[in-house]
């Protein structure tokens, strides 16, 4: 199961850590897949105005700028130069793995407006370990992004 966990993170697939009861299809980048015509699971939440605002959390990928550093699940994202407190908390890292294909640590997590911030660098702060790691916001798809290997 560990290999499957790494592969799902490399491909950007949401699983238990990303589906915690606080997230919607919109947060996962799947909002357009929710039917507007027929009732379905997630339909009611997808119509709530507050959950469809521009500044909601979006599932994205994270790469450490120093490829020798390991990402830590549970770290919180703070903009560089900002004080590390709840007021400046932008989101959290939900899943991490070492990618044997990319040869470095990768992570999935939620950050405000994440899908509009690819390439931006933020701090992944873990107060319990007293660690601050600079990470780059990335597409949640790390490997075979176009699906060429999948489809041959």
Question: Where are the regions a protein language model picked out?
Answer:
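Conserved, structured C-terminal
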Residues: 1-152
């Amino acid at each position: 199961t560990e290999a499957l966990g790494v592969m799902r993170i490399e491909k950007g697939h949401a699983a238990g850590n990303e589906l915690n009861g606080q997230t919607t299809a919109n947060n996962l980048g799947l909002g357009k897949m929710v039917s507007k015509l027929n009732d379905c699971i997630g339909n009611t939440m997808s119509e709530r105005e507050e959950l469809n605002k521009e500044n909601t959390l979006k599932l994205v990928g994270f790469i450490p700028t120093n490829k020798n550093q390991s990402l830590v699940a549970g770290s919180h994202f703070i903009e560089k130069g900002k004080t590390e407190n709840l007021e400046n908390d932008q989101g959290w890292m939900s899943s991490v793995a070492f990618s044997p294909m990319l040869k470095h640590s990768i992570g999935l997590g939620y950050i405000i407006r994440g899908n509009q911030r690819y390439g931006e660098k933020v701090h992944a702060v873990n107060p319990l370990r007293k660690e601050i790691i600079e990470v780059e916001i990335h597409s949640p798809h790390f490997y075979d992004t176009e699906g060429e290997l999948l489809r041959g």
